[in-house]
Amino acid sequence: MELHIWPSDFGLPTIDVVSLQFLACSKMCASPVRVIQSTRPWRSPSGELPMVAQTEGEAKPVTDFEKFVDILKKCGQDVVIDADLTTIEKAQLDAFSCYLHHNLYPAVMHTFWTDELNYNTVTQYWYASHLHFPYNLYYLEKRRKKALRLLAGKNDTEILKEAFMALNTLSTKLGDNKFFCGNKPTSLDALVFGYLAPLLRVPLPNDRLQVQLSACPNLVRFVETVSSIYLPLGEDELKRQQANRKMWQSRISKAKADKEAAKTTEEASESLPEEPPMRDAILFTLGALTLSLVFAIHTGLIQVSVEEEISE
């Protein structure tokens, strides 16, 4: 079985949310899946990564997380994901997964795909540099339109408010535990890790969601725990990512500086009195001249004489 995921960066084995969920789940149950970093999403039936290619028989590739979890349960490895959960706990897990998809996932998509500053500074640059031209233009446009459709009808404030509540709910549920269902990871832990890890690790100029996540120390500890136990990076990969760190820091710093400059300019323009439009100024001038002329004639300052033509 092969798991095709997006490449690694920013201290993560892959920067994609769903790719992280697939990878974390496979590692938590010690599945002998072969991981392949790919930049060819067109090979997937959904046109997206991750994709699980099953080498046995003629099984179709899998791109759905729940279906992947079902496959892992039937693989026969020693560690079976979610095997120790009761029926009630499994129902709670399903309910929590649905809650996160509706309240946290939209904010993650907004942060990386529809926030103009984050998209132009990080997302667009990263994917454009990993995909060949002109396919990168098509793919970025497709992904962004998909995110915009997902968020249609919601404003930024509403999206972030729901996400903040979701993070607080996650923090409360985790408490002081190592994982969300005790001391043994479940598919919920893989799901949550995929949502949180990019928010925590990827540098962003608009970092409101990152700040809120950082204010929940137990969630930060959870991400670090999963990363160190199940998804550690090799030395070569760490060196490669370290080489790109200055470039990303420069891009983020420039984006933040441009943001502050634009904010200062906007505040300065708002503090200036509004100048009347040119049309209004011209009409006002003509009106004033007309009134002055009428007043002058009425008071006798200007006299108008009419001479009759004498016919011979």
Swiss-Prot record:
<dbReference type="InterPro" id="IPR036282">
    <property type="entry name" value="Glutathione-S-Trfase_C_sf"/>
</dbReference>
<dbReference type="InterPro" id="IPR033468">
    <property type="entry name" value="Metaxin_GST"/>
</dbReference>
<keyword id="KW-0812">Transmembrane</keyword>
<dbReference type="GO" id="GO:0005737">
    <property type="term" value="C:cytoplasm"/>
</dbReference>
<protein>
    <recommendedName>
        <fullName>Metaxin-1 homolog</fullName>
    </recommendedName>
</protein>
<comment type="subunit">
    <text>Associates with the mitochondrial contact site and cristae organizing system (MICOS) complex (also known as MINOS or MitOS complex).</text>
</comment>
<dbReference type="GO" id="GO:0015031">
    <property type="term" value="P:protein transport"/>
</dbReference>
<dbReference type="Pfam" id="PF10568">
    <property type="entry name" value="Tom37"/>
</dbReference>
<keyword id="KW-0653">Protein transport</keyword>
<dbReference type="Pfam" id="PF17171">
    <property type="entry name" value="GST_C_6"/>
</dbReference>
<keyword id="KW-1133">Transmembrane helix</keyword>
<keyword id="KW-1000">Mitochondrion outer membrane</keyword>
<dbReference type="GO" id="GO:0007005">
    <property type="term" value="P:mitochondrion organization"/>
</dbReference>
<dbReference type="GO" id="GO:0001401">
    <property type="term" value="C:SAM complex"/>
</dbReference>
<dbReference type="InterPro" id="IPR019564">
    <property type="entry name" value="Sam37/metaxin_N"/>
</dbReference>
<keyword id="KW-0496">Mitochondrion</keyword>
<comment type="function">
    <text>Involved in transport of proteins into the mitochondrion. Essential for embryonic development.</text>
</comment>
<comment type="similarity">
    <text>Belongs to the metaxin family.</text>
</comment>
<dbReference type="InterPro" id="IPR010987">
    <property type="entry name" value="Glutathione-S-Trfase_C-like"/>
</dbReference>
<dbReference type="InterPro" id="IPR017410">
    <property type="entry name" value="Metaxin1/3"/>
</dbReference>
<dbReference type="InterPro" id="IPR050931">
    <property type="entry name" value="Mito_Protein_Transport_Metaxin"/>
</dbReference>
<feature type="transmembrane region" description="Helical">
    <location>
        <begin position="282"/>
        <end position="302"/>
    </location>
</feature>
<keyword id="KW-0813">Transport</keyword>
<keyword id="KW-0472">Membrane</keyword>
